[in-house]
């Protein structure tokens, strides 16, 4: 049975909703995927993520191929052209199919009169592809980052910025966390190999496995039974730094979607975990993950700046604060971050992090441990944030995560195979 939709036009709509309406792909794609077949969902994701990964390059190429940019109601066709060029430059889709489907996308988008324009621009790109792609390696579009973010990264990492940028522009690896309640990591590796899935263990993590060629979770042995969870290596490490212990009261603040909550409970299944997040919709994901993994926690909707509304005068032995942040360490996983984030957001996020840290500190027991974590690579949110916190709180001290140049542990993307992350482990005197 032939599909009644055009996938390229749907992708153009996804790009439009990100760039012109400020929505994230993680919000946009699930809604758009409701009306397409399971077979087409990976391609929609590949095209949407791919276009946003190399956006400046596509913008520059279209600027070379067209005299006037498409504006107003025709702007959606600008994004359709991006989808077409991305297919020709970066995918194995046969050129004739990429052209035909993209041109038909103009009809689906109710711009039949511009089919010829779309066809002409794409064919012109085909003729000039080698020359144009070579030019993009030597012009302002080369780094594939907004100028403000590139400048900040260069300032923060004068020796490593190129490595960091290159990592951001790659497709991310797929990491798993083995639930050791059911299997050891080596046992699960054997199950993967028996299923024909190539994988390798992380050198220093007790639970992490990297899938060599990312695959649907539905084919992972025991995924629906809670044997394994998809979670980046760096995200796993911050829970390991927390060192949860059975019998303790543990708070996971800003917990959604619940990956760290469930890992706490896998390490210490008899701990009393409270998982809190401000987003009611994302709290549903926490509950879903707890159910799949057969874990039990108290789940609450609440603002980290106002624990008096949900903490009920409790004090905790350990607190994991995965703070709201710029997410600049996970750009390879969420390339839309580059275009949704604004430079002025950083100061606001730093202020929010500071307020949450100050508000939650009194709820940590004496001699208790707090792990502050972000998926950011920017010093303002990380080392500098912890430096300011230590100056405000004389009863706080770092506990073994500091390095020579940082009050905590800063990981840049791909350094250990994981995402960009920051951790600081604090104890209360």
UniProtKB/Swiss-Prot annotation:
Active-site residue numbers: 375
Keyword Lipid metabolism present in the record's keywords: the answer is: no
Q: Which reaction does it catalyse?
A: cytidine(967) in 16S rRNA + S-adenosyl-L-methionine = 5-methylcytidine(967) in 16S rRNA + S-adenosyl-L-homocysteine + H(+)
What the entry lists under InterPro entries is as follows: MeTrfase_RsmB-F_NOP2_cat, MeTrfase_RsmB-F_NOP2_dom, NusB-like_sf, NusB_RsmB_TIM44, RCMT, rRNA_ssu_MeTfrase_B, rRNA_ssu_MeTfrase_B_ent, RsmB-like_ferredoxin
Q: Which residues does S-adenosyl-L-methionine bind?
A: 254-260, 277, 303, 322
The record's subcellular locations are: Cytoplasm
Pfam families to which the protein is assigned, alphabetical: Methyltr_RsmB-F, NusB, RsmF-B_ferredox
Say which enzyme class the record assigns.
transferase
Enzyme Commission identifier(s)? 2.1.1.176
Q: What is its main location?
A: cytoplasm
Q: Which GO terms describe its cellular component?
A: cytosol
- One Gene Ontology term from the biological process aspect of the record: regulation of DNA-templated transcription
GO molecular function terms here?
RNA binding; rRNA (cytosine-C5-)-methyltransferase activity
Q: What UniProt keywords are attached to this protein's entry?
A: Cytoplasm, Methyltransferase, RNA-binding, rRNA processing, S-adenosyl-L-methionine, Transferase
Q: Which SUPFAM superfamilies match?
A: NusB-like, S-adenosyl-L-methionine-dependent methyltransferases
Q: Hey, which family's this protein in?
A: Belongs to the class I-like SAM-binding methyltransferase superfamily. RsmB/NOP family.
Q: What does this protein do?
A: Specifically methylates the cytosine at position 967 (m5C967) of 16S rRNA.
Q: Quote the HAMAP family the UniProt record gives.
A: 16SrRNA_methyltr_B
Name by which UniProt lists this protein? Ribosomal RNA small subunit methyltransferase B
Tell me what organism the protein belongs to. Photorhabdus laumondii subsp. laumondii (strain DSM 15139 / CIP 105565 / TT01)
């Amino acid at each position: 049975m032939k599909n009644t939709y055009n996938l390229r036009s749907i992708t153009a709509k996804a790009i439009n909703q990100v760039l012109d309406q400020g929505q994230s792909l993680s919000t946009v794609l699930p809604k758009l995927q409701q009306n397409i077949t399971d077979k087409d969902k990976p391609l929609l994701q590949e095209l949407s993520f791919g276009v946003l990964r190399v956006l400046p390059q596509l913008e520059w190429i279209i600027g070379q191929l067209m005299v006037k940019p498409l504006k107003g109601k025709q702007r959606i066709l600008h994004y359709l052209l991006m989808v077409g060029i991305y297919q020709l430059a970066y995918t194995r889709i046969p050129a004739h199919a990429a052209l035909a489907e993209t041109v038909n996308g103009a009809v689906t988008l109710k711009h039949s009169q511009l089919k010829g324009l779309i066809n002409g621009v794409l064919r012109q790109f085909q003729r000039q592809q080698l020359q144009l792609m070579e030019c993009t390696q030597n012009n302002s579009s080369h780094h594939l980052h907004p100028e403000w973010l590139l400048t900040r990264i260069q300032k923060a990492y004068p020796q490593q910025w190129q490595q960091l940028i290159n990592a951001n522009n790659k497709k991310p690896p797929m990491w798993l966390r083995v639930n050791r309640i059911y299997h050891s990591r080596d046992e699960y590796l054997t199950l993967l190999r028996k299923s024909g899935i190539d994988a390798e263990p992380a050198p220093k993590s007790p639970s992490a496995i990297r899938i060599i060629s990312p695959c649907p979770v539905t084919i992972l042995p025991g995924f629906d039974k809670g044997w394994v969870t998809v979670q980046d290596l760096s995200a796993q490490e911050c829970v390991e730094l927390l060192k949860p212990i059975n019998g303790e009261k543990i708070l996971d603040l800003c917990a959604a979607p619940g990956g760290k909550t469930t890992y706490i409970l896998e390490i210490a299944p008899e701990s009393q975990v409270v998982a809190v997040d401000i987003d009611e919709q994302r709290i549903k994901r926490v509950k879903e993950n707890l159910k799949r993994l057969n874990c039990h926690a108290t789940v609450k909707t609440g603002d980290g700046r106002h624990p008096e509304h949900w903490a009920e005068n409790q004090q905790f032995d350990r607190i994991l604060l995965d703070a709201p942040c710029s997410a600049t360490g996970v750009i390879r996983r969420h390339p839309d971050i580059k275009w949704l984030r604004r430079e002025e957001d950083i100061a606001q996020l730093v202020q929010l992090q500071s307020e949450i840290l100050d508000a939650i500190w009194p709820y940590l027991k004496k001699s208790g441990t707090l792990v502050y974590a972000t998926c950011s690579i920017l010093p303002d949110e990380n080392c500098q944030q912890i430096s300011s916190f230590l100056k405000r709180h004389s009863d706080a001290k770092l506990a073994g995560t500091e390095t020579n140049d940082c009050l905590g542990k800063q990981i840049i993307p791909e350094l250990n195979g994981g995402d960009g992350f920051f951790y600081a482990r604090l104890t209360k005197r």
